[in-house]
């Protein structure tokens, strides 16, 4: 299995499932998306996660994904500030992947139970609109995924100014646990505890 990151919170799994594509020019510094897949899923309907027109759907390409939706909030006031958020658990080829979308609050007990035994956790870390780096590190400790991919943060030349940088998250882990990878993460090799991805420029 392979995972591609296109910046912000947008990923594609095995060329078949796109998660949270962003609309054109909605995220500073991120490339325009022109993707194809058999399916696209969205955590919520804000422009930086809901680029419906940026994904060409090619049906019946044989991909078999089992997807579970977990309701959550985009803020810590039960959605009063930014509305609802959907966490997705994706099961494919014997692996469990969770994408937390724009999670803006702590996980409750039931959510934590559903999010156990993860191979990959995609988690926002930038703060302001979502949980911040410290809160994200706590959640990683609670869920103990095999590998965590940080998302929704600011880099040197991409992302919103209000967001924190990835080093604010990685400082909570040992250097040996962190690996910087490219645009594509292959899941058939040994996975680091934290995989910091890049996206095509």
Feature roles, as predicted:
Residues 79-143:
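Active-site-proximal loop/helix segments of hydrolase catalytic cores
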Residues 47-94, 171-191:
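Metallo-beta-lactamase
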Residues 3-4, 81-82, 147-201:
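Binuclear metal-ion centers of metallo-dependent hydrolases, dominated by the metallo-beta-lactamase
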Residues 37-38, 119, 146:
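Conserved acidic residues
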Residues 9-60, 71-85, 103-114:
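Pre-active-site segment of Zn-dependent metallo-hydrolases
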């Amino acid at each position: 299995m392979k995972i591609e990151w296109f910046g912000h919170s947008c990923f594609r799994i095995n060329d078949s499932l796109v998660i949270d594509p962003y609309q054109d020019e909605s995220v500073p510094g991120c490339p325009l998306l022109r993707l194809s897949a058999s399916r696209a899923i969205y955590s919520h309907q804000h422009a930086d996660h809901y680029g419906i027109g940026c994904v060409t759907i090619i049906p019946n390409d044989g991909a078999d994904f089992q997807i579970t939706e977990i309701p959550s909030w985009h803020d810590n006031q039960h959605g009063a500030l930014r509305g609802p958020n959907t966490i997705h658990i994706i099961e494919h080829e014997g692996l469990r992947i969770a994408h937390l979308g724009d999670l803006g609050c702590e996980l409750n007990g039931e959510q934590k139970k559903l999010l156990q035994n993860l191979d990959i956790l995609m988690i926002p870390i930038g703060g302001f609109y979502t949980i911040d780096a410290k809160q994200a590190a706590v959640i990683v400790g609670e869920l103990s995924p095999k590998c965590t991919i940080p998302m929704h943060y600011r880099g040197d030349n991409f992302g919103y100014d209000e967001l924190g940088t990835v080093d604010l998250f990685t400082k909570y882990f040992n250097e040996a646990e962190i690996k910087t990878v490219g645009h594509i993460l292959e899941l058939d090799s040994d996975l680091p505890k934290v995989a910091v991805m890049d996206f095509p420029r």
